[in-house]
């Protein structure tokens, strides 16, 4: 497959509905259509990837950052630079809007993504979260734009 033929599109409600149908409601609920940026990737008619980031005010400071709420690439399309391209596109849009930094969370089960975050200049902070009282280990990642 030639990655230069992939189509990167701003997500809209129709795309969000499509994600819900094809990838599930849980994935679709992480797509933010306002106060941020959401981009989907198509190979022909096949949805192969998406990213969504939304704005958050930082405490104690009058600056805003974007939190990458979801970054997914279909298993068959991984290791082709799609996630990197999505992050670079969101970074560019964030810079255009004067956003201070990008942040994300990468859980232990997605450890394969850590080298990508590092290669893109993100700092890593090991941490645990406790959704529903159960520990989930991983990393917070952040990059000042």
What kind of feature is each model-predicted range?
Residues 4-69, 74, 87:
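Acetyl-CoA-dependent GNAT
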Residues 94-106:
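Conserved GNAT acetyl-CoA-binding A-motif
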Residues 73, 79-92, 115, 119:
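Conserved acetyl-CoA-binding loop-helix of GNAT-fold acetyltransferases
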Residues 84, 108-126, 134-135:
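Conserved active-site alpha-helix within GNAT-family acetyltransferase domains
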Residues 58-59, 128-132:
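Short proline/glycine-enriched turn/loop segments at secondary-structure junctions
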Residues 36, 135-140:
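Short hydrophobic/aromatic beta-strand or adjacent loop that forms the aromatic wall/cage
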Residues 42-44, 142-145:
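Active-site beta-strand termini and strand-to-loop segments that position acidic
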